[in-house]
């Protein structure tokens, strides 16, 4: 399988990783983890949204489901209903981020204390336009929050709280990412999300086939493996082109880098 030539962000630094080939027999089939899904119901610690948008937005009281999915990476998603009084400013600096805001959600325990590895979950960049419209529209709207997380779903998760993100801090933190990505339009984010989902799912299937071949060689499985390996190569090419064209939104580029990092761990250190 071809390696992905990616933009990789770690500790808010951007690294370029060169592509290389790997022998399918070197895939870490024994390290294959099954996909896993779980969820937990959370209540807001308060309806107040802290920060600069507190005078405009508030959380609608209720229970909300946090979904956790483990594939190559771990993902946490939650949709929260937010009420707007329509008295905000859509041209506020808060809405010029397009990476991870303007809202941030902390998953908390029963006492309302944030759980470290499930904190600062930004609202989905796909909802930034909706939030901007909410500044001048009175009503209740669903806003999604998602992120790649570093740990399993915490057993003590029970509540959450939302705050406004400091846009200037985000701009400084993600400055290197911005110049390498699409920060202008959200028109194609669904297209690129689908590409990355397809790549991640296909790679997991490829690992499963390789594990099966490691147990027993047979022509049918080998043929299926070869076809899927070709598909993954083609998806890699598409990802590389999107990186070259700076087509990914910043959080998508970060996801590509994290996928590359995880695959590198599973397959071993790539040849340069």
Give each language-model segment a name.
Residues 4-13:
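Sec-dependent N-terminal signal peptides
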Residues 25-71, 171-216:
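Immediate post-signal-peptide N-terminus of mature secreted/exported proteins
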């Amino acid at each position: 399988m071809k390696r992905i030539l990616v933009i990789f962000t770690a500790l808010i630094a951007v690294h370029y990783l060169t592509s290389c080939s790997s022998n399918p027999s070197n895939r870490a089939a024994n390290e294959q983890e099954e996909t896993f899904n779980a969820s937990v119901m959370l209540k807001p610690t308060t309806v107040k949204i802290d920060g600069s948008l507190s005078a405009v937005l508030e959380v609608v009281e209720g229970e909300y489901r946090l979904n956790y999915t483990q594939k190559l990476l771990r993902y946490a998603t939650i949709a929260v209903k937010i009420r707007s009084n329509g008295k905000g400013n859509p041209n506020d600096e808060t809405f010029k981020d397009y990476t991870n805001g303007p809202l941030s959600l902390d998953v908390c325990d029963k006492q309302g204390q944030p759980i470290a590895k499930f904190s600062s979950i930004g609202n989905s960049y796909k909802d930034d336009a909706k939030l901007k419209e909410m500044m001048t529209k009175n009503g209740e709207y669903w806003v999604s929050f998602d992120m790649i997380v570093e740990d399993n779903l915490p057993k003590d998760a029970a509540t959450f709280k939302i705050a406004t993100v400091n846009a200037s801090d985000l701009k400084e933190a993600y400055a290197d990412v911005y110049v390498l990505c699409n920060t202008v339009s959200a028109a194609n984010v669904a297209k690129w999300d689908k590409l990355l989902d397809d790549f991640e799912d296909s790679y997991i299937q490829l690992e499963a086939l390789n594990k099966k071949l490691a147990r027993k060689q047979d022509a049918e499985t080998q043929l299926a493996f070869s076809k899927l390996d070709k598909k993954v190569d083609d998806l890699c090419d598409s990802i590389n082109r999107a990186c070259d064209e700076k087509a990914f939104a910043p959080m998508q580029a970060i996801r590509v880098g994290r996928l590359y990092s995880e695959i590198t761990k599973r397959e071993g250190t790539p040849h340069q």
